[in-house]
Amino acid sequence: MQDPAAYYQTMMAKQQQQQQPQFAEQEQLKCPRCDSPNTKFCYYNNYNLSQPRHFCKSCRRYWTKGGALRNVPVGGGSRKNATKRSTSSSSSASSPSNSSQNKKTKNPDPDPDPRNSQKPDLDPTRMLYGFPIGDQDVKGMEIGGSFSSLLANNMQLGLGGGGIMLDGSGWDHPGMGLGLRRTEPGNNNNNPWTDLAMNRAEKN
């Protein structure tokens, strides 16, 4: 009778010689188009283990093992922008001459109105709620070009009789624990918050 350890070793050696790779990742296949051994496994088509996809590095084409070969041109996976670059460079070369001709033929403003030239430029950063700050033509902003005329002195949000005072001087309920003082009716001229906010908006 044969030693079981020796029998096991010989059987394992035979299996390794006869056994082909179990997964497609381990296979080194030749390209079916150019017969190059310079190939690699990429992925399984639709996650199906029976359809491994391979890539040939020499002819730069993909194929599925056991599948039909498509008529794909060599290097079809790469993008070449050389034609786009040449057309864009030729159009950019002709554009400076066109722009210089446009500058020569451009007419000055047909209606040179001094009132229009004195209007301030409407910078989009100076827009607040859709109204340009400092534009005197907007109704409701005739006084100094600010929104301070639109604010009521003691406007209050109704929160059960109390609420937040919008004049910026404090909270209506001093027990809020924030250390802010109670609004006093005679202290409206001494309110730094609304003037500070309006001055900040006007300086921009």
Curated annotation (Swiss-Prot):
Zn-finger segments (Dof-type): 29-83
Keyword line: DNA-binding, Metal-binding, Nucleus, Transcription, Transcription regulation, Zinc, Zinc-finger
Amino-acid positions noted as binding Zn(2+) in the UniProt annotation, renumbered to this chain: 31, 34, 56, 59
Cellular localization per UniProt: Nucleus
Annotated InterPro entries: Dof, Znf_Dof
PROSITE patterns (UniProt xref): ZF_DOF_1 (PS01361), ZF_DOF_2 (PS50884)
Basic and acidic residues bias: start-end ranges: 106-124
Keyword DNA-binding belongs to the record: yes
A GO term, aspect molecular function: transcription cis-regulatory region binding
Superkingdom of the organism of origin: Eukaryota
Biased composition (Low complexity): 84-102
Keyword Transcription: yes
Region (Disordered): 1-25, 70-128, 182-204
Alphabetical list of Pfam families matching this protein: Zn_ribbon_Dof (PF02701)
GO biological process, one term: regulation of DNA-templated transcription
Cellular component terms (Gene Ontology): nucleus
Function recorded in the entry: Transcription factor that binds specifically to a 5'-AA[AG]G-3' consensus core sequence.
This protein's name: Dof zinc finger protein DOF3.1
Origin species: Arabidopsis thaliana (Mouse-ear cress)
Designated gene of the protein: DOF3.1
